[in-house]
Amino acid sequence: MSNPLVNWWRSHNFNEAVKSQNNRVAKQLLKEIENSGAKLSWQQKLFKERLQLEKLLQKKNDRIKEADRHLEELERQLSFGQLDDSLGRIDELTLFPDTKFIEHISKSFKLRDCDESMIQCTGIDEKIFNNFEQHLAGFIKNELNKLNREKNNVDDLLKQAVDDIQKLKEGQDPQYSFELSPHIYLMRYFLDNVYCTYLAWFLIYKAGLLPTKVNILDIAAGPGTVAYGLGLLLQSSSDFFSMPPMHISYYSLEQQKAFQYRGLQFWRQYMEPQAMNAYFRFDTSSIFDRENQSKRLPKKFFDFIVISHCFFNDEERREKSLQIYKDIFTSSLNDYGYALLIIQEKKLLIPYNVRRVDDCQHELSVVRQFIDELGLNLVWYKYLNSIGSRTSPPNFGKFARENLPVKEFISPLFRQHFKLPYDIHYGVDDYVILAKKR
């Protein structure tokens, strides 16, 4: 039998199994269809999503039963005048994915599954991001105005920081050490990176993996991009369900103290009034200072260790950093924790002498090779991409103007300080990789 005929026969039998509510047979046939590489029909996709939701519901029920068991044990101990750490474990539940909220985010960001791994994203939650961007632009303007009153060489300082950060366009690693580097970063790359981490946390939430009590280590944290992405996602959910008590412990590991300071300064102005229950701890040191870090970083403590865009172009620094990351995952990630890696397409592919991947299997082999270097096991990955293609359009500027949300409040600052005659748009071209330690 030819493959099309085999696929048709499997699909026919699958439909019959679903109609007769024979879930065991339907599951087996769905697995065979997926393994064959055939594209899933809408009914098969719907059935698969139903299975995933049932699995999440069962997981939630199991956690509730476990919490009830801990509560009974705690009550028993209290009756005997005893108390252990059971109380701390009762609240370790995950946020259960809300269907309407997931639909809202998918629609707002115009998320489209292009293939097994690539998701096109051309939209935004305007209510959340417009307000956030407007406040950010105001924050940057106020800081620069304050500096203009205090110093006579602000233009020179701005040029230093702009020239440094523009090295990214040339495939080099910026120093980020100039006085106004934080301001220029906030102006140029902060919103895109928050946009990406927002979507990364959304994928984790959608998979039912986001705890209500979460300990996060953010390596090379910058101004706290990872915390902002999570904070805005939780803010987005307020119209859809009642948020259970959340507790976010955020550990920022960052070499540049000025980035940490500016990030915390803006957080206090914008995020804290949103009643965000977040505790910050700052470790101002280089990732290459591993000996001292190993003494400070808690052991087997973190639910998520995140590395967002801190992967080097320089080969020697890249190899050294990957070994350090591997050591940190081994020592500081708890037994049930996850590594969340966000890396640009070029920085993932080029070290393996790959310029472009044209199929998912080739892409998967590169991702697995990368994960293996970090001593991790892959859980899943997604390639978030604004253009919906693995090849760039001949005129990306035209595509952006016609399809991507503009940064309405930051663009005037960008035009002024980068001396470029066009607006900038929200966009993403990153791999979001979730992994666990071995």
Predicted regions and their residues:
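Generic helix N-cap/helix-start motif at coil->alpha-helix transitions
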Residues: 2-12, 23-24, 39-48
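Conserved class I S-adenosyl-L-methionine
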Residues: 212-222
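Conserved small-residue packing positions in alpha-helical repeats and bundles
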Residues: 13-17, 49-55
